[in-house]
Amino acid sequence: MAGFGLPNFGQLTEAFKKAQQIQQDAQKLQEELDAMEIEGSSVDGKASIWLSGNQQPLRVRLAPELLASGQEATEAATLEALQNAYAQSTATMKERMEELTGGLNLPGLGG
């Protein structure tokens, strides 16, 4: 088979083992990201939003004094908290994906 440009059986076996390990690691990472709770807050701390590591909304907390300050202020603080939580969540996901794929030299996936 060596004359056909195919890898030897040992190389092929190693490639399959590596692919299986990557699949297991990716599943574990997915579970870890799902279990994470990442908090983003408005600058004044009166609005907080929690997202998972996969950017799924989990909780919202709005301080009573924020609600009393009116609709516009409440909307602005809520949006600020959401943007903060999203930025932290996506950065965490990217960092963890780069850890997983760092040694693979896959285009667009870190490393």
From Swiss-Prot:
Gene3D superfamilies linked: Nucleoid-associated protein YbaB-like domain
Pfam family, one: YbaB_DNA_bd
Listed name of the protein: Nucleoid-associated protein SynRCC307_0025
Primary localisation category: cytoplasm
Sample GO molecular function, one term: DNA binding
Species the sequence originates in: Synechococcus sp. (strain RCC307)
Keyword field: Cytoplasm, DNA-binding
Keyword check for DNA-binding: yes
NCBIfam families: DNA_YbaB_EbfC
Subcellular location: Cytoplasm, Nucleoid
Regions annotated as coiled coil: none
GO cellular component: bacterial nucleoid; cytosol
Subunit structure: Homodimer.
Family: Belongs to the YbaB/EbfC family.
Function: Binds to DNA and alters its conformation. May be involved in regulation of gene expression, nucleoid organization and DNA protection.
